[in-house]
Amino acid sequence: LNILLITSKNKKGYSVAMLDGIKAASADYLLIMDSDGQSNPEEIKNFWKNRKKANLINGHRANRKDYMYRKLYSKLAFFIYKLLFNVPLKDPSYAYILMEKKVCYTLNDFKPQMPDGFFWEFNARAKSFGLTFFNLDIIHNERYFGETRIYHWSKLPLVSYNNLLGMIKIKFFD
């Protein structure tokens, strides 16, 4: 098993860190999965079984286990996202994705416009390159450890505003 740990002395933010990992990927496929315990590693075999169906196999939290306020903000963002980008995904923000190597090469060098919405942006950019998607229903668990820091209810209005601005920049100015 070839695993590469990418570290930095400086805090670079989630989106830049994700891009660094994607740039470093060298295998034929790259699997990205959040490590907060909400995504079941057993699902990896389902991603692998479906790997030939599209360039990106995107997890969809079929039974999303999150606070109501997060689901509401997510639904509103999804509505705007669909209007702007029409990406054929049920859950474009979910960090559980299997992608081909060509996706890594195609989408590893952009300046993130949505620092707290990396996968929203990544999937919108993938669609603009004509890449294909497959939705894979995933059983979503409650978070095992800790609380979200960035998506806390007190920070969500600012995060949502910044992500909306990012969507507008990507759609009209990028």
Task: List the predicted regions and their residue ranges.
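Acidic donor-binding segment of Leloir-type glycosyltransferases
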Residues: 1-6
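Acceptor/aglycone-binding surface of glycosyltransferases and processive sugar-polymer synthases
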Residues: 8-24, 29, 41-116, 143-164
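A short, conserved beta-strand element in the Rossmann-like catalytic core
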Residues: 36-38
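Catalytic donor-sugar/metal-binding loop of nucleotide-sugar-dependent glycosyltransferases
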Residues: 114, 123-141
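DNA-recognition element of transcription regulators
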Residues: 120
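C-terminal, non-catalytic tails of nucleotide-sugar-dependent glycosyltransferases
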Residues: 161-174
